[in-house]
UniProtKB/Swiss-Prot annotation:
Alphabetized PROSITE patterns for the sequence: CHAPERONINS_CPN10
Keyword annotations from UniProtKB, A to Z: Chaperone, Cytoplasm
Subunit structure as annotated in this protein's UniProt entry: Heptamer of 7 subunits arranged in a ring. Interacts with the chaperonin GroEL.
Family stated for the protein in its record: Belongs to the GroES chaperonin family.
Function of the protein: Together with the chaperonin GroEL, plays an essential role in assisting protein folding. The GroEL-GroES system forms a nano-cage that allows encapsulation of the non-native substrate proteins and provides a physical environment optimized to promote and accelerate protein folding. GroES binds to the apical surface of the GroEL ring, thereby capping the opening of the GroEL channel.
Name this protein carries in UniProt: Co-chaperonin GroES
Protein's GO biological process: chaperone cofactor-dependent protein refolding
UniProt-recorded Gene Ontology molecular function terms: ATP binding; metal ion binding; protein folding chaperone; protein-folding chaperone binding; unfolded protein binding
Subcellular location as annotated: Cytoplasm
Organism this protein belongs to: Shewanella denitrificans (strain OS217 / ATCC BAA-1090 / DSM 15013)
Main location: cytoplasm
Protein's gene: groES
Length: 96
């Protein structure tokens, strides 16, 4: 995958989760909830501060994160694979 996010943006591959109902039935498609966990595939250089310096991101390639899939999240297909482009501010936690 040849993509480089700009500024404080990251490229995330959503992690698959197996969704089961309370009765143990595996849910698929629209009945299953989408995961809000993903693996960081690429990171931008950082956020430009008012004093002109660049603050590096707190995450790195390979980190598993929990993200907020809100207004600023962009879905794209790169090399046939769906990825999410989002700002570091949309990341809520690093797992592990």
């Amino acid at each position: 995958m040849n993509i480089r996010p700009l500024h404080d943006r990251v490229i995330v591959k959503r992690l698959e989760v197996e969704s089961k109902s309370a009765g143990g039935i595996v849910l698929t498609g629209s009945a299953a909830e989408k995961s809000t966990r993903g693996e960081i595939l690429a990171v931008g250089n950082g956020r430009l501060l008012e004093n002109g310096t660049v603050k590096p991101l707190d995450v790195k390639v390979g980190d598993v994160v929990i993200f907020n899939e809100g207004y600023g999240v962009k879905k794209e297909k790169i090399d046939g694979e769906e990825v999410l482009i989002l700002s570091e501010a949309d990341l809520m936690a690093v797992v592990g």
